Amino acid sequence: MSSGGAGEYNEDRHLLRSTDGDEVGIGGGEGDLDVESQSPAIRSGAGGVRDLFKHIDRRFSLSGRRLSFKRMENIRVDRERHNPSSSSAFSAAGEEDGGGISNLHSVDDRNDEYGFDEEVLGDSAPPEWALLLIGCLIGVAAGICVAGFNKGVHVIHEWAWAGTPNEGAAWLRLQRLADTWHRILLIPVTGGVIVGMMHGLLEILDQIRQSNSSQRQGLDFLAGIYPVIKAIQAAVTLGTGCSLGPEGPSVDIGKSCANGFALMMENNRERRIALTAAGAASGIASGFNAAVAGCFFAIETVLRPLRAENSPPFTTAMIILASVISSTVSNALLGTQSAFTVPSYDLKSAAELPLYLILGMLCGAVSVVFSRLVTWFTKSFDFIKDKFGLPAIVCPALGGLGAGIIALKYPGILYWGFTNVEEILHTGKSASAPGIWLLAQLAAAKVVATALCKGSGLVGGLYAPSLMIGAAVGAVFGGSAAEIINRAIPGNAAVAQPQAYALVGMAATLASMCSVPLTSVLLLFELTKDYRILLPLMGAVGLAIWVPSVANQGKESDSSEGRSTGRGYSSLSPSERKTEGVWRHTDNADSLELTVIENPDHNSFLDEETILEDLKVMRVMSKNYVKVSSGTTLREARNILKESHQNCIMVVDDDDFLAGILTHGDIRRYLSNNASTILDENTCPVSSVCTKKISYRGQERGLLTCYPDATVGVAKELMEARGVKQLPVVKRGEVIHKGKRRKLLGLLHYDSIWTFLRDEMSRRRSINDRRKDKEVGTNGH
């Protein structure tokens, strides 16, 4: 930590540590680290917009700057190219101080020595007020794009099903099959063919992009074309009636808007997560006209799986602003009506609560069947492609054909907006509404058709199908329960109408299928605006979430360690967790909305950067360090250093709080500057010699520390940027305001990071190999 080696010592140009003031350590949350000198960026600009953000940042940004791995490597290479001899001397001098505890110069010294301009090194993310403004812009952009997407779906639907009334499925069910079979069968197949052809186009664009990756400068226009094509695929899928929903694509549109703004700036991982969360919230808010549910959706699918404590403190404000603005824009363009009309219903008594709990478990069981069907269909289509050598574009056509065949018997499985859901919600109140027995068949058919469409590669979401399946299951359960109880107790009217159970079933199925319990509860509450439904709703949702976790517990135990985020809780693809790429083409086209189906990309969790971003400092730090009290003499400290073979000693005060750090370099500088005698060593306390504070850019700051819940990637970048090899780990939150002291927990060694990284990569590679062997044995090919 202290610098070593010979030469004149300048206290203002050494040992960048900071724990004082508002800049106490790293790890997000309270007291984010100050990394004012940590963002050298040797990257090409991407046009006037990015330059504007950079200019704003240089003038106003005071915090939140990080150094990426690739930038550090670029700077190191450029330094060696500019002055190889100085670089070698610099490294040698750094090793002189007891095993290379730190380098001789601070970052500012290196900038001067190697000719780096401070304006270049100041390049980083915009300030908080600018990001809040960007959150508003994301809301506007997402609202406009989602409205355009919905208009496109309606245009395609009206053209494909011309002459069919708005009630669609109910009308088709009442017609003679001989008059309608060709349309029911051929229209979804046509949609599948178009989607499959566009899959082929995406593969061509992916190959072009990879071939030009080495020559790419500035903005990647192919990356902007990709989400547009995906939105068109989703519009065609839904417009031709295939059994999926529009909310997943709406969320993807919001995420794409956020990615577009993120690519215009130099952003760290946490700010990308914040922008993605704002995009996800705006997508679901504009899709459902439910701003509150959009906020909770972002929290559940983005912030929760990616450690919300590492996100910037203004993330929640960004999410709320984006959600409200996108919902407002969507209202202005599409109207203020809700996604579907909630019928009148009545909750009879609290004695029905056990029935709602049973319904929750039933919905959970349905979601388990559905998720396994999706996996089975996906693997089946992959097997067919490999076995018969079929191109990937054929699979969506087969999915459309399967949906059409099912629709010949049950036309209610076709996507027709939310008219099918409204028809179910009016069971018993409308002559055209299906009966209980037909609803049971329709629920089963919808599960199979949706899993088939999703597994075949058709593009769409699961929210709308989940709501329809849940409504059907709830209506069947409520109607059956009422009939059984009325037969057992004649004249008893203590059971609510099927509409109440249908509403609760919708939320429970949605929560279980997509792992969004809070979003489901808030969404239904926003739609019904009835507080009475919350108690049965929350009970049913809780059990609906519990059933899949129990059912999948055995299956996940073998593979959970092989996935960096765990089952079903991440809204970001592995490639998006890195600081570099956000454009990735995958065959299964999972959207943000689909959180329960496992992402098949297992290569990213073996990536060095991904592992470092997933690991916490507490797993790598060492608790085997030497500490002495501040009253220990310098002679005693020197003997302890020699006997313990340590490079540094942690100095603590009488209350065992971190007071400073003592290195061989500190001792040599004290002895040379003070011409001290043996008597001085025997009487001088280490508190007078150790490093306690540093002056950096005209400000006096304390020791540089980190928190145990910080990511190893952030700590590594900080150590590289500040030229230190050890970093004290202190307890978060226990700040003694008088002196701002911290409780010492451990010591993070730079060399230990690489040792742990090698071991972790080996462990994950072994898990991945076992998983692949198991899959081969299961699939039989």
Curated annotation (Swiss-Prot):
PROSITE patterns: CBS. It is a multi-pass membrane protein. It is found in: Membrane. It comes from the Eukaryota. Coiled coil: none annotated. GO terms for cellular component: chloride channel complex; chloroplast; Golgi apparatus. SUPFAM superfamilies: CBS-domain pair (SSF54631), Clc chloride channel (SSF81340). Residues 1-41, 79-98, 553-584 are annotated as: Disordered. InterPro entries: CBS_dom, CBS_dom_sf, Cl-channel_core, ClC, ClC-type_chloride_channel. Residues 10-20, 575-584 have a biased composition (Basic and acidic residues). The chain crosses the membrane at residues 129-149, 184-204, 221-241, 250-270, 279-299, 314-334, 350-370, 388-408, 433-453, 457-477, 502-522, 523-543, 726-746. Keywords: CBS domain, Chloride, Chloride channel, Ion channel, Ion transport, Membrane, Repeat, Transmembrane, Transmembrane helix, Transport, Voltage-gated channel. Voltage-gated chloride channel. PANTHER family: CHLORIDE CHANNEL PROTEIN CLC-E, CHLORIDE CHANNEL PROTEIN CLC-F. Belongs to the chloride channel (TC 2.A.49) family. This is Chloride channel protein CLC-f. It comes from Arabidopsis thaliana (Mouse-ear cress). The gene is CLC-F.
